[in-house]
């Protein structure tokens, strides 16, 4: 479990919520005022920012990109730890087996490793494919998997771009309604709330959810696996 990711979210949202709740007493002291939290909850703003961002992502990416979200969250919060030394020992072990018992003996040993990339590599060797061709095939597979990982992180980077944009759309909607109903004092504050809160939602969604997920996912794929295999 990656406690740093959990801690980052807790600290981030915690600081924001506490800052919203903090009020100042007449004597200059600070106190928590729960009623202040109501001003930051606005259903139309939520619909504009969250609904608009999801809709834009639906237009931009196929369904399989959304289906991968649980898998990506698992990688971020529960990353697998790999020991490079273990892979070196496995390769040396397979090399010794091939030298003593022949290449075909490696087929029975493949069950001892769970890494798909390593298994595929050994199978290519067992099939007596030329070394240059094996190297070419493996490099091509690595390039394909790396490109797929780039596309996976692009989903969240795009989300971090769309969220503030829809926050600005909500701000424009609120300002238009505000200017169109200046004589109606009952809706004046509501339209102003929509104008400001949507920007707030968009910035939070982009900089505390989408962009951190994209950066952490990229880091996990680069540094916590021996090969881009997921």
Model-derived features with residue positions:
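Helix-termination/interfacial motifs at the ends of transmembrane alpha-helices
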Residues: 2, 7-10, 14-31, 144-220
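Conserved small/polar residues in nucleotide/adenosyl-binding loops
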Residues: 223-230
């Amino acid at each position: 479990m990656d406690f740093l990711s959990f801690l980052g979210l807790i600290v981030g949202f915690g600081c924001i919520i506490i800052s919203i709740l903090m009020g100042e007493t007449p004597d200059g002291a600070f106190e928590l005022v729960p009623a202040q939290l109501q001003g930051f909850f606005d259903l139309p703003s939520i619909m504009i920012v969250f609904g608009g961002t999801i809709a834009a992502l639906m237009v931009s990416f196929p369904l399989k990109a959304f289906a991968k979200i649980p898998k990506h969250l698992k990688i971020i919060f529960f990353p697998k730890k790999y020991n490079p030394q273990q892979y070196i020992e496995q390769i040396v072990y397979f090399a010794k087996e091939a030298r003593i018992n022949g290449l075909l003996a490696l087929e029975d040993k493949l069950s001892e490793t769970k890494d798909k990339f390593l298994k595929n590599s050994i199978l290519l060797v067992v099939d007596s494919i030329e070394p240059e061709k094996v190297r070419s095939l493996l490099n091509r597979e690595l390039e394909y998997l790396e490109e797929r990982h780039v596309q996976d992180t692009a989903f969240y980077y795009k989300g971090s771009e769309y969220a503030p944009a829809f926050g600005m759309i909500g701000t424009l909607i609120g300002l238009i309604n505000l200017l169109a109903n200046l004589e109606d004092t009952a809706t004046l504050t509501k339209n102003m709330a929509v104008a400001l809160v949507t920007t707030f939602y968009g910035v939070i969604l982009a900089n505390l959810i989408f962009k951190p997920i994209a950066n952490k996912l990229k880091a996990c794929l680069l540094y916590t696996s021996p090969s881009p295999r997921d």
